[in-house]
Amino acid sequence: LAEFFPGQDAGRSWCYDVEIGAHQLVPTGVLAPRGREVERIVDHMEDVQFLADGWFDYPAAANRADWYNLGGFSKVQPYYTRNCEVYALRDEVKPFIRSYFNSIAALINPEVLTLWEHFHHSGAWDKTHETGYFLHQTRTMLVQERGEDLWLAPFITSKWLEDGQGVTVRKAPTRFGTVAYEIIPHPQANYVEARIEPPARRLPKQIVLRLRHPEGKPMRSVAVNGKK
């Protein structure tokens, strides 16, 4: 769009090549998440668009110098961009987590914990759309339907399974009904405890709980209701 309408929308038509660009065809079901086209789209977003000159706090030189912390999100209105959804559909855990937290850091108002429209000081404050999409991403982090399967904790950070940490989810809405679960790590004893209250309206074909050890150690055994 930028080459054809460079002055549109306060001179920011360039951002629509990525924020409402071709990647939107993935979560809407037009492009297969694991297709070669989608891999190229995501690579271009990460390597080019997310590191280009953005609004206010994000000049290209700074983005490229600190690509890990300042990458992973678009540079005008990050929650227009659905790259976290694309990562979730591709089951790419670490890219999802990076984009999730980097976007929050770019938009959060630390005084009242609301979300700006355009980064730390610009646009609407306490923005409804940004709040809604933050909740949408958080829900995907904690609960995700995959066909007739229900995944729990599919994209949580492994830091939450360190000593003294844990995850508790209550009354999470899914198309199977509400679900609840709790993950309690016991790193000193080398095990993780999980309690699940499955949905009652319609049972999923499978309930999948993802547990990633903070140090990357493999799982040795599993016991369900006391039975291995």
Model-found features: residue ranges?
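Active-site core of glycosidic bond-cleaving carbohydrate-active enzymes
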Residues: A2-R146, K205
